[in-house]
């Protein structure tokens, strides 16, 4: 979202930097991310201090990145005193998307992310985003406890409470995502989850998880199974839209769940009425509409 800050948090070695580079490639060329998600072509700036230029170059070669080099710039050394310089660069170069990797390395030289100073840095970034219209995506780490496994050895799913450091950090972002390795496919390919934890922008449903497949050879990601969950998301959005229109156009009439279910189900004239919508899905989306109404 333009003029806002989003954060992606994950354990070390999960692939945050690779995901950033893959998004950068898609945005600078205007190509769909994962060959599925539309992007807006624009200038991108990456502030990278979580890995060296040499290591990054090796990763780019392995990923076979093909960005539009005229639309991407990098910064490999950073100090919080460079905030004003960053703002001027964004304006001068018409940068619309800025990646920062990672928050702890960029703003936590002292190693203490639990102070109010972390909140000050978030305030400063938000100020730059608001003044320039640039969208920021900041990579961050999870607390060390996140590495612990449950008794059944299943990976722990990130929550906002797992974000490392002060609550001021999470409070200062508009949207937040948690990323983790969910397991492996039958062929040993690593599988990842990307969960929408903070939804102030309302991009998709809160706590929705994209399913990503990873390639150990290329270190690239792709949407896994039913377009990474996009097919189910599209179906749910379609149900929600139909319910909203039906209720709005029939106000103040009252409907039962069964009546709403029948009304939005597909009709096949040659074989009678056939439902393509599970009634449980209707109930779930109705609860979502009630929650949305309560928030407004």
Regions found by a protein language model. Give the residues of each.
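Walker A/P-loop NTP-binding active-site region of P-loop NTPases
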Residues: 1-67
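Flexible, glycine- and charge-enriched loops at secondary-structure boundaries
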Residues: 17, 76, 111-118, 166, ...
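Conserved inter-motif catalytic segment of the P-loop NTP-binding fold
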Residues: 38-127
